[in-house]
From Swiss-Prot:
PPR repeat ranges per the UniProt record: 151-181, 184-218, 221-257, 258-292, 293-327, 328-358, 369-404, 405-439, 440-474, 475-509, 510-544, 545-579, 580-614, 615-650, 651-685, 686-720
Protein name: Pentatricopeptide repeat-containing protein At5g28460
PANTHER family, alphabetized: PENTATRICOPEPTIDE REPEAT-CONTAINING PROTEIN GUN1, CHLOROPLASTIC (PTHR47936:SF1), PPR_LONG DOMAIN-CONTAINING PROTEIN (PTHR47936)
UniProtKB keywords: Repeat
InterPro entries: Pentatricopeptide_rpt, TPR-like_helical_dom_sf
Family to which this protein belongs: Belongs to the PPR family. P subfamily.
Species of the source: Arabidopsis thaliana (Mouse-ear cress)
Organism superkingdom: Eukaryota
Length: 766
C-alpha cells in the first residue's frame, strides 16, 4: 500500500526526484556495528588506514600499495571496509575512500556487500555533519545510480534523518523503494516514528495497520508499541478509547507497552475514575500472555486502595500470581498501607511476613524498609495496640537498613495521645532525643492536638513553649489547634492572643483560622472584633464561607443591627453565596421578633423560590413570633398549615410554644388539647410541656388534673427540673400534697389511691 500520494498533497517541502525503480532489491541486512575478532582482519584494517593516512589523497588512485591492499583485503570479510571507512574519522575522507573503493570495486570479491557497508559508514558521518541535507541526498543518489543496496541500518538512518529535517516525502521515498520483503519491523518502526512526529497520523497508521494484521510477515514488537503509544498519548492524537483499542491490538500479537508508559496510562485512567477499564486492559494483556511487570498493577492497586476496595485488590494480587508476575517492594507498601487504613492490621502484618524476602522480576529481594515499619506501627497505634507497636519498634531497630526516624516516633506519640496517655506521649519525645532524633513540628502538633482534645489546654501551651525554647517552631496547624481550643472554651481573649503570636511568628493564617475566630467571637457576641477579623480575612485574600456568613448574620440579628445584617446579605450576593435554610430561619426569626410579619412572609416566599422548603425551625420561628404578640389565631393557622400543606410535621418545640402561649392566657383547655394531640401524633412531650401546663393549673380547683399530669410525667420517664419543682411547691403546699410531691420526686405515682407506699417513706416522713 502506497502512502506517497496522501503525503504529497499536504507537504511540498521537498520535490521528489524522478528516478526509475531499481530492477533489484535496494537493501542489504547487515549488523550495524560488527566486531572484528580475527587478528588478521584487525591487522588488515590498521595497515590499510595507516597507508591511506600516509598517502596523499590525490595519489590514492595511482598507489600500487593501496591497490594491492584492496585485493588482499577483499579476501577478508566485507566488514573490513566498513571498519576502515569508520576509522578515517571524517566525512570528507570517508566519502573519498568510498569513491576510491568504488573505482577499484572490480577487484573486490564481494563487491555489493563491501560497497554497502562502506556506504553505511559514510552515511553515519554525513548525518553528524552541521548541514547534512545535501550530503545525505547525494549519498542516496549515489546508491541508486550505482545500484548499491543499502543496509538496513543505512536505510533506517536515512529515513530518520530526512524526517528530522522535515523532508518526510524523502523519508517515505526511501521506504517505498525498498522491496516488500525488506520492509521489516525495524524499518517500519522508524517510518511510523517519523510520520507521527511530523503529524501525519493517518499515514503512520496505514503502515502500522499492515504490521497489526493477524498474518503479518513483519508484526509489531515492543519498540513499535513504545513509539506509537508514547507519541499518540503525549500529543493527544487519539482518544483514550482508541488508545485502549490499540493496546488490545498490540496485545493480540503478544506485545505489551513498556512498563513505564503502561503504569502512567493506568494511573491516568484511575485518576479519571476508570478503574474498571484499567482492570480490563491488564486482564486482556494477561490473557494474551504478554510480558508484564509489577508497576502497572501497583498503579491499579493504589487506586483500589484509595477506594478501600480490598476484595478486588485481593483478586488482582491472585491474578498476578497466576501469571507469575512477582510483586515488588512497592506492592508490599500499597497492600499494608491499605489494610492498616481499613483497621485490618492483623492481615497487614501477615502480608508483611509473607512477602518480605521474596524475589522480584528484576532479581532483587523484597526487603522491609522504614516506611513499611512506620505504616505498621501507625496501624497498630490507630487501633490502640500500643504494646505491639512498641514491640515492632524494637524489631525495627534490629532490622538491616531500618533505622527509626521522626515519623516512627510521631506515630507512637499519636497513638498515646489518642488513648489519652499524654504523659507517656511526652516520654516518647524524651526517647526520641535519646536516640538523637530531633522532634519536629509534627511532633509538636500531635501532642498539642492530643492535649487540647483531652482538655489539657494549659498543658499544651506549656509543652509548646518548651519546644520553642528547644528550637522547634510551630506552624499554622499548631496555632490553629490552640485557637480552636481557646474558642471551644469561650476564651476568645486567649484565642486572639495566639492569633497575634502566629502573625509575629511569620505564619500566614488560612481561612480555617479566621473561621474559628469568627465563630468564637460570635459565640461571645463581640461583634466589633468579629468585623475586624472579617476585614483581616479579606486582606489575606480569603472569602467567607456560608457557615461564617450565617454566624455573623445571627450575631448582628441578636445585636439588632439591621444595617450590618443587610451588609452581610449584600456581601453574600457579591461572593455568589446563596442563602440556605439557616440563613432564612435566622432572618425570619429576626423579623418575627420585630413584629415585621410582612418581611417574614416575603422571606418565606423567597425561600421557596430558591428551592428551599421551610423547615420545622422556620415554622417554629414564625409561630413563636405570632404568639409573642398575641396573634394566636395566625399562629394556629400556620400550625395547621404544617400538617396539611407541608411535609414538615410539628415537633415538641412548636407544640411547647403554643401550649405555653395558651397557658399564659389561662386557656388550659386549649393547652391540654394540644398536649393530647401530641400523644396522638406520637410527638413526645418534655419537661417544658408539663411546666407550661402546671403554670396554668390551680391546685384548689384543678388538683386532680395536676396529679394526673405528674403521674404522666412519671410514666413517660420525663425528669422534672428546678422550674418544675418551684411551680409544684407553690401549687402543693399542704402536708399531704408535700408527701405526694416527695413520691413524685422519687419516681412514684401520686394520683392512684391504690398506689403502694415506698418502703422508704416511713423513714423519709419521720
Amino acid at each position: 500500500m502506497s502512502i506517497m500520494l496522501s503525503i504529497s498533497r499536504r507537504q511540498n517541502s521537498y520535490i521528489l526526484l524522478n528516478h526509475s525503480r531499481f530492477l533489484r532489491r535496494f537493501s542489504y541486512d547487515v549488523d550495524p556495528r560488527p566486531e572484528i575478532k580475527s587478528e588478521s582482519q584487525e591487522f588488515v584494517v590498521v595497515k590499510f588506514v595507516k597507508t591511506l593516512q600516509n598517502t596523499p589523497q590525490h595519489d590514492w588512485a595511482s598507489s600500487e600499495s593501496l591497490s594491492a591492499l584492496v585485493v588482499s583485503s577483499s579476501s577478508a570479510s566485507p566488514l573490513v571496509f566498513s571498519q576502515i571507512t569508520r576509522r578515517l574519522g571524517s566525512y570528507s575522507l570517508a566519502i573519498s575512500f568510498f569513491e576510491y573503493l568504488d573505482a577499484k570495486s572490480q577487484s573486490l570479491k564481494r563487491r555489493e556487500e563491501s560497497l554497502s557497508l562502506a556506504l553505511q559508514s559514510v552515511i553515519e558521518f554525513a548525518g553528524s555533519e552541521p548541514d547534512p541535507r545535501d550530503k545525505l541526498l547525494r549519498l542516496y543518489e549515489i546508491a541508486k545510480e550505482k545500484n548499491i543496496p543499502l543496509t538496513i541500518v543505512a536505510t533506517k538512518l536515512l529515513i530518520r534523518w530526512f524526517g528530522r529535517m522535515g523532508m518526510v516525502n524523502q523519508s517515505v521515498l526511501v521506504y517505498e523503494r525498498l522491496d516488500s520483503n525488506m520492509k521489516n519491523s525495524q524499518v517500519r518502526n522508524v517510518v511510523v516514528d517519523v510520520l507521527l512526529r511530523n503529524g501525519l497520523v493517518d499515514d503512520a497508521f496505514k503502515v502500522l495497520d499492515e504490521m497489526l494484521q493477524k498474518e503479518s510477515v513483519f508484526p509489531p514488537n515492543r519498540i513499535t508499541a513504545d513509539i506509537v503509544l508514547h507519541e499518540v498519548w503525549k500529543e493527544r492524537l487519539l482518544t483514550e478509547e482508541k488508545i485502549i483499542a490499540l493496546i488490545s491490538r498490540f496485545s493480540s500479537h503478544g506485545v505489551s507497552p513498556n512498563s513505564v508508559w503502561l503504569t502512567r496510562f493506568i494511573s491516568s485512567l484511575c485518576k479519571n475514575a476508570r478503574a474498571n477499564t484499567a482492570w480490563d486492559i491488564l486482564s486482556d494483556l494477561m490473557k494474551n500472555k504478554t510480558p508484564l511487570e509489577a508497576p502497572p498493577f501497583n498503579a491499579l492497586l493504589s487506586c483500589l486502595g484509595r477506594n478501600m476496595d480490598i476484595s478486588r485488590m485481593n483478586d488482582l494480587v491472585l491474578k498476578m500470581d497466576e501469571v507469575k508476575i512477582r510483586p515488588d517492594v512497592v506492592t508490599l507498601g500499597i497492600l499494608i498501607n491499605t489494610l492498616c487504613k481499613s483497621r485490618r492490621v492483623d492481615e497487614a502484618l501477615e502480608v508483611f511476613e509473607q512477602m518480605r524476602g521474596k524475589r522480584t522480576d528484576d532479581g532483587n529481594v523484597i526487603k522491609a524498609d522504614s516506611i513499611h515499619f512506620n505504616t505498621l506501627i501507625d496501624g497498630l497505634c490507630k487501633v490502640g495496640r500500643l504494646k505491639e507497636a512498641e514491640e515492632l519498634l524494637v524489631r525495627m531497630k534490629l532490622e538491616e537498613r531500618c533505622v527509626p526516624n521522626a515519623v516512627t516516633y510521631n506515630c507512637l506519640i499519636d497513638g498515646y495521645c489518642r488513648a489519652g496517655k499524654l504523659e507517656t506521649a511526652k516520654e516518647v519525645v524524651s526517647r526520641m532525643k535519646e536516640d538523637e532524633i530531633k522532634p519536629n513540628v509534627v511532633t509538636v502538633n500531635t501532642i498539642v492536638g492530643g492535649m487540647c482534645r483531652h482538655h489539657g489546654l494549659n498543658m499544651a501551651v506549656v509543652f509548646f513553649m518548651d519546644m520553642e525554647k528547644e528550637g522547634v517552631k510551630g506552624n499554622v496547624v499548631t496555632y490553629m489547634t490552640l485557637i480552636h481550643a481557646c474558642c471551644s472554651v469561650s476564651n476568645v481573649e486567649k484565642a486572639m492572643y495566639w492569633y497575634e503570636k502566629m502573625l509575629e511568628a511569620g505564619c500566614s493564617p488560612d481561612a480555617k483560622i479566621y473561621y474559628a475566630l469568627i465563630s468564637g467571637l460570635c459565640q461571645v457576641r463581640r461583634d466589633h472584633d468579629a468585623i475586624r477579623v472579617v476585614e483581616k480575612l479579606k486582606e489575606g485574600g480569603f472569602s467567607l464561607d456560608l457557615l461564617a456568613y450565617n454566624m455573623l448574620i445571627g450575631l448582628f440579628c441578636d445585636k439588632n443591627n439591621a444595617e450590618k445584617v443587610y451588609e452581610m446579605l449584600t456581601d453574600m450576593e457579591k461572593e455568589g453565596k446563596k442563602p440556605d435554610s439557616i440563613t432564612y430561619n435566622t432572618l425570619i426569626s429576626f423579623f418575627g421578633k420585630h413584629k415585621d410579619f410582612e418581611s417574614v412572609e416575603r422571606m418565606m416566599e423567597q425561600m421557596r423560590e430558591d428551592g428551599l422548603d421551610p423547615t420545622v425551625t422556620t415554622y417554629g420561628a414564625v409561630i413563636d413570633a405570632y404568639c409573642s404578640v398575641g396573634e394566636l389565631d395566625e399562629a394556629l393557622k400556620l400550625f395547621k398549615d404544617m400538617g396539611l400543606h407541608s411535609k414538615v410535621n410539628p415537633n415538641t418545640v412548636i407544640y411547647n410554644i403554643l401550649i405555653n402561649a395558651f397557658s399564659k392566657l389561662g386557656n388550659f383547655g386549649q393547652a391540654l388539647s394540644l398536649k393530647e394531640e401530641m400523644k396522638m401524633k406520637m410527638v413526645r412531650p418534655n419537661v417544658e410541656t408539663y411546666n407550661a401546663l402546671f403554670k396554668c393549673l390551680n391546685e384548689k380547683t384543678q388538683g386532680e388534673t395536676l396529679l394526673k399530669l405528674m403521674d404522666e410525667m412519671v410514666e413517660q420517664s420525663c425528669e422534672p427540673n428546678q422550674i418544675t419543682m418551684e411551680i409544684l411547691m407553690e401549687r402543693l403546699s399542704g402536708s399531704d400534697e408535700l408527701v405526694k410531691l416527695r413520691k413524685f420526686m422519687q419516681g412514684y405515682s401520686v394520683a392512684s389511691p391504690t398506689e403502694k407506699a415506698s418502703p422508704f417513706d416511713v423513714f423519709s416522713l419521720g
